[in-house]
Amino acid sequence: MPLLDSFTVDHTRMNAPAVRVAKHMSTPKGDAITVFDLRFCTPNKEILSERGIHTLEHLFAGFMRDHLNSSNVEIIDISPMGCRTGFYMSLIGEPTEHQVAVAWLAAMEDVLKVVEQSEIPELNEYQCGTYEMHSLEQAQEIARNIIAAGVSVNRNDDLKLSDEILGKL
């Protein structure tokens, strides 16, 4: 099985909260696609609560679009990582890590402005596979933690696993 890009970086050296360009690629027509690793938690040390990450999934996707989409950037998808330490964001365009960090912090501020759980988008059995597994309180706690810590940048060159280490794994 081919080694996926996300497994060629050293998770023991990742900072969090931090943004990282996980992948650049182009469509056959030449459109740039960028995948970002939005790392909320330090891998293997912290984890996002399942209710909190699920509520963030519903809120974060819309709020990030509000702050990052433009004439040359369009978010395709924002999905939680299976390890529950962050989200992957795929988009058309090539915003800088700084632009993404600014949008991320603004989106976290928006999460704090949500007053009631009933304001969470698509919170019903028709549009959500586990619509009862949500917590606005936990999502807002995550948002407060991100705002308090700030968002840094993880660079692939700093995190690259050596061929020697990869050969031993």
Swiss-Prot record:
It is an enzyme of class 4 (lyase). The keyword Iron applies. Binds 1 Fe cation per subunit. Its cofactor is Fe cation. GO terms for biological process: quorum sensing. Coiled coil: none annotated. GO terms for molecular function: iron ion binding; S-ribosylhomocysteine lyase activity. Fe cation binds at H54, H58, C128. It holds the Pfam family LuxS. It catalyses: S-(5-deoxy-D-ribos-5-yl)-L-homocysteine = (S)-4,5-dihydroxypentane-2,3-dione + L-homocysteine. Its EC number is 4.4.1.21. Keywords: Autoinducer synthesis, Iron, Lyase, Metal-binding, Quorum sensing. Homodimer. Belongs to the LuxS family. Involved in the synthesis of autoinducer 2 (AI-2) which is secreted by bacteria and is used to communicate both the cell density and the metabolic potential of the environment. The regulation of gene expression in response to changes in cell density is called quorum sensing. Catalyzes the transformation of S-ribosylhomocysteine (RHC) to homocysteine (HC) and 4,5-dihydroxy-2,3-pentadione (DPD). This is S-ribosylhomocysteine lyase.
